[in-house]
Amino acid sequence: MVSGLDTQTPYTAPNSACVEGLAAGNSVTALRASLKAAGNRVYTAPAQNGPGEISSTSGFGPSSQCPTPLPASMTINTTGSINDGGQNLSTFLTYLHTAFGINTVDLVGHSMGGLFARSAIKTLKDSSSSVTVRSLTTLSTPWTGTYPADYATGKLPITACLNQPSCVQVLTGYKKLAASEGPRGAASIISTEALQGPSGFNARQADALKGIPVTLIGGDHFTRPGGLPPLWPSEAVVGLQSALATTLPDSAL
């Protein structure tokens, strides 16, 4: 399991998780429990909202007394670049192969975690890795960009919210996050332009997902008739159009 933008997720294994607080951070704990209950062997990829390893999480729903943290080289920086995160994720998957004999994985990525997973898949394929990705499932992943990033980078006016209070709150809060990370931070590099431009992330990925079944899931809790499709409907941060990659060619999937 791979968490998304600005998240903290400690490394956990099927029989090893955090003892105090949430088992695996506030982003993926519930889904981890559901997948384990269904009989899956579940590992959470370590992720930190900054460089370095992670031994516990802070903020809402903290986790502590977690399994021994893995090195920074295996830990995704959820405020950094997609490709750096993908490289560290691929290193983590290689570790699972070396340490536990895992040859095949199903990746589940939440939000930006889906982009980290896509980048890791390309890295594994390009290096002829011994690890095979059997499937990819993305949950509200901004395949073609996210409208708060478009607002933060000056490409979308706040009037696109159509005076919807939660939308205005999301955009203003997101812009503060993007400003704190800087123009190369994760919050800015998942804009429509950065992902969909001629030399953007999607173009560079080419056919990396060829032969891999992909399941895309998005949310539509917030909607406004007549609103801009990249924004409405959405689950609050990622529009359904982007989460379902409706404007991407089939070859990209």
Per-segment meaning from a language model:
Residues M1-V108, M112-P157:
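N-terminal non-catalytic accessory region
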